[in-house]
Amino acid sequence: MIKMWRLQIVLVPPSAQDIITFLEARLNTPQSVSPMVQYNEDIITHNNSINNCSDPSPTSPSSQNSIQSNRSSDFINYLPNCKKFLHFTDGDNTLLQLSNEILTKFDRLYPNFKESIEIVSLQDRHGCDLDSEFIIKDVFENDGVVLVILKDELDWSRNQHISLLQLARQRRRQDNKPSTKSIVTEKRKKISKEDLSSISNKDTMHLIAKSSLKNNFINKSRVSTPLMNEILPLASKYDALNKEKCPMPLTSTVVASNVHKDVKDHARAKEGVVTQGSDNNKENIPSSTQQQKNDGAKRAESKDLDLLRNSSEDADYEPADENSPQISFDSIDTDFQLSTTSHTNSDMHIQYSNPSSGAHSPRKSSLEIKVQNKKGDDLPLNDKDIGENCRRIEAFSDEEDFNETDNDRADSFINNSKKASMGFRDINSDLDSVSFNSDIENAVQSTQSTKNVVSPPFFPEKELNNRLHQSQGKEALFRLVEKEFPDKSLGAASSTSHAKDVKIQETIRKLNRFKPTGETKVQKRNSITEPYYGKFGIMKKDKPKSITSKGVSLETKHFDDPNTIISGEKFAKFGKIKVKRKTDDVGSKVIEFKRKRNMGNRSLKDIFANAGKPPNAASTIKVVKLMRDPVDNSKDKVEATSNSTAQEQEQVSPKLPVMNSTPGKRKNGQAIPSSLERTPQLKKVKVTRSHSSPSSSSSMSLESSLDSSSSDDSDDDSDSRNVQVKKINFKTSHGPAGNSNGKPMLDVDDNEINTKKYQTPKYVESDEDDQ
């Protein structure tokens, strides 16, 4: 079991060392000199005798040592500029370990003391210097006094008094950071035994252990909240992060460009280090000019690059430099591409793209890294590429301008144009409108316009098939660019070979921003099948129209206007093509089901409207309302009366169709009622039909049987007759329902529908005058 030693640590500055020596000399004098000390010894002896304790006599050496230690510690309390505190440690530790523990304890007890302290040596209560290899239990007794001799004075006037509550909080804050505490402890234990043994005087320990401000973990933990740690982070944290990053080779040239127009300035970073951060912490990427200065290489083309960059319409574009691998970082929305090519046509393309959202934020950005290694002085343009570019420049219309398109696909166009200007070949591009194949037919098909024809003076077909010299082809291409797109801003800079290449690159880059030809659209339309919508087909009136010279294709979604490019859900200048599909909701399905179920049934209104009329005659009767009076129990007196006579005449041409809801089952030219009682009563309804010529419309009026006497007079004057319709009783039965074709009707769940079957009613027409 480890036995802990209780020690009294006394910090003695240089000004208090002489006083301690004087006190030690006074304490070593005979005890009779001090009557007060003798009085205290008598009291201690008397108390021990009362408690029957076998304590040694006051004159024994052990008792004298304990008394003298207590006296010395009591006198030290009154020394100026001294500090005393209690410390517990293991008795088997050395004095070197004790000195490190004293420094740690001092930092914990006095956190406001900002000055660094240095321990010169450790002494016992007699003022003897001690060796650092001594064991604590061999030198000090339990509750002994350890004098810590300091190099500098302790100025306590500059430090504020700290309360116990503040001290407890400080300790809890330190306990939460064990790593910091262990680091400081290890730094203070770096003094080895060999360093101490190298001192000339081995009997005296000159322990120099500094507690500087830099290594003091108390001073490093001044920030108490996590939020302040984010606002005021330590400088060493950034140093550690920068060391973890992989440095780029010094021979590479870094070109940084940001597509967003609101970010104009490039941040600066350390040489050869490229860090990728979030949107809140912008990246520090050195520009190409700064990197060239760091490398010490002065290039003559740097002036031309700056000139062309300022005169170009794309302010963020930087042309490729020569004889050096290049790395360009472009902040482009939802695009991450890594492309590495060389002049030997070896391609490597890695692309990761996210679906573009409807609303683009200027803070959304991603990174594109393109690495290109070039071995030649000139751009790697072969003969077929030169011929292709000549065709495209000649075929380009003068009506189309080079204005930037403000849409969500503009970044991808600029991205592909830069790859074209630096000799890249896009393998898996998401836009088919930009193609850089070495095949002349494919390039011409995807880039040239249909309304212009290639002019033969520059490159006839026979000359294109032959292998042209690099310098001749590029010179002819540059002359064509100067002819088609003159630029006065170049001036004398156009005489150099590099300036000509840059001019060609700029022209090709601008040509790549426009739509493909109509032939490409037709091929895309033929390759894409018509979408199938399953159960519901496309209506004829909603089918997309075919592609015309000024139309819009449903699949390709390109427009004639070069400044209008749509993608996703955005609307273009001519609107948006939408395919309408036939949709049936629940309500319409229920209505359709009821209509099919009641297809063979007719209402009473339709029955009385068509009563006594030929089957093919045009309907001219509209029954407004039928009222039923209470029916008596007797079978002889059954009459149907209405509260008010409903009469309505309607003038309709005979050619109009019959006003029937749905065709139903008929028997002998008479319709079947839709809803009747199981045992219907006999009804008597008076129907008056007026006869007229076929050209004029006929009219029929319904009257109550009670008003028959009043209507007889009018019938005599006009050519009309009273018709009495009688309905007899009939039986009902249950069975499966059928439609007009005789097939059984099914419900939504494909089950047969059972309905009531009625016997066909018979109607008898008779004149009341005959009766």
Swiss-Prot record:
One of its GO terms (cellular component) is nucleolus. Residues 48-69, 271-330, 346-367, 633-771 are annotated as: Disordered. Residues 275-294, 346-359, 640-652 have a biased composition (Polar residues). It is found in: Nucleus. It comes from the Eukaryota. The modification Phosphoserine is found at S397. PANTHER family: NUCLEOLAR PROTEIN NET1-RELATED. Interacts with HPR1. This is Topoisomerase 1-associated factor 2. It comes from Saccharomyces cerevisiae (strain ATCC 204508 / S288c) (Baker's yeast). The lineage of its organism: Eukaryota, Fungi, Dikarya, Ascomycota, Saccharomycotina. The gene is TOF2.
